[in-house]
Amino acid sequence: MAGCGEIDHSINMLPTNRKANESCSNTAPSLTVPECAICLQTCVHPVSLPCKHVFCYLCVKGASWLGKRCALCRQEIPEDFLDKPTLLSPEELKAASRGNGEYAWYYEGRNGWWQYGERTSRELEDAFSKGKKNTEMLIAGFLYVADLENMVQYRRNEHGRRRKIKRDIIDIPKKGVAGLRLDCDANTVNLARESSADGADSVSAQSGASVQPLVSSVRPLTSVDGQLTSPATPSPDASTSLEDSFAHLQLSGDNTAERSHRGEGEEDHESPSSGRVPAPDTSIEETESDASSDSEDVSAVVAQHSLTQQRLLVSNANQTVPDRSDRSGTDRSVAGGGTVSVSVRSRRPDGQCTVTEV
């Protein structure tokens, strides 16, 4: 304890200006480059994730393709992080593009050339100066082979995909360094990228892509003459034929009602000729609900709402009513040259059914 007191006392006895100067010189940390927890080396173009962990840009790129999560805390990496990374030192990227020597190494991208990172450039220059025919490079967790004779690079386990490389002066126009664009303009960044670990510009072209129109799933209706009509706009020929059929039905309704057998109390009900025939409805949304309400209005003639229901009604009438009181057997021609048989069945209070075909 005495030693600690003496240390504190000696520090307090120092002059004020000297303490300030020494504190500045001793405590001011030098700008050290952080180490990457993925490659276990000094970070090259360090970037900071949203979780504040720092890695090499290419190391993050390789890790994001494998798991899309931080290598330390497993927090999810945003989808657009590779296109809009958070660089700790943007000035370092510009300095790397200027280079330290006269020559630099480049790999081919879309509409331009990319400069290799500082570490990879040193490896390539060292192999080239020693006269090697090829050398291996570890980029974003993938092993690449640089063929220095044919000046191409490819993955060691995928020889089919090759990319040109070259050794050129440092001042040539370039797109960026190691997949990082020198012009970090949001308008020039395309979010659709392929899996290219070397940071090449492998953006898929989307300008020619067009939006395909949605195909309607509604099946069109078929008119009487076989032509396709829209569900919302029924065929005018079909509507006209139905109206003519019901008009003919109204004229022959009196004779049909008189010839049919009448039960007790039916004299008080109106005949179909004195009632008003409802207008036909060709809406596809309607169902057979009107057929169940015939007993409530015995004088009303039930109008069927589609040609399919009319044909089903004719087949049912042939099975349930063998003896019909009247059958006109006349078919009306429609616009397409075909014929249609319209049948309407009415129910009377005594349970008998009267079927009239037009």
Curated annotation (Swiss-Prot):
The modification Phosphoserine is found at S289, S293. It catalyses: S-ubiquitinyl-[E2 ubiquitin-conjugating enzyme]-L-cysteine + [acceptor protein]-L-lysine = [E2 ubiquitin-conjugating enzyme]-L-cysteine + N(6)-ubiquitinyl-[acceptor protein]-L-lysine. GO terms for cellular component: cytosol; nucleus. Its main location: cytoplasm. Pathway: Protein modification; protein ubiquitination. SUPFAM superfamilies: RING/U-box (SSF57850), WWE domain (SSF117839). InterPro entries: RING-HC_RNF146, RNF146, WWE-dom_subgr, WWE_dom, WWE_dom_sf, Znf_RING, Znf_RING/FYVE/PHD, Znf_RING_CS. Residues 305-322 have a biased composition (Polar residues). Its EC number is 2.3.2.27. Residues 253-358 are annotated as: Disordered. Pfam families: WWE, zf-C3HC4_3. Residues 91-167 form the WWE domain. SMART domains: RING (SM00184), WWE (SM00678). The keyword Ubl conjugation applies. Keywords: Cytoplasm, Isopeptide bond, Metal-binding, Nucleus, Phosphoprotein, Transferase, Ubl conjugation, Ubl conjugation pathway, Wnt signaling pathway, Zinc, Zinc-finger. Coiled coil: none annotated. It is found in: Cytoplasm, Cytosol; Nucleus. A glycoprotein binds at Y107, R110, W114, Y144, Q153, R163, K175. A zinc finger (RING-type) spans 36-74. Ubiquitinated; autoubiquitinated. Autoubiquitination is enhanced upon poly(ADP-ribose)-binding. E3 ubiquitin-protein ligase that specifically binds poly-ADP-ribosylated (PARsylated) proteins and mediates their ubiquitination and subsequent degradation. May regulate many important biological processes, such as cell survival and DNA damage response. Acts as an activator of the Wnt signaling pathway by mediating the ubiquitination of PARsylated AXIN1 and AXIN2, 2 key components of the beta-catenin destruction complex. Acts in cooperation with tankyrase proteins (TNKS and TNKS2), which mediate PARsylation of target proteins AXIN1, AXIN2, BLZF1, CASC3, TNKS and TNKS2. This is E3 ubiquitin-protein ligase RNF146. It comes from Pongo abelii (Sumatran orangutan).
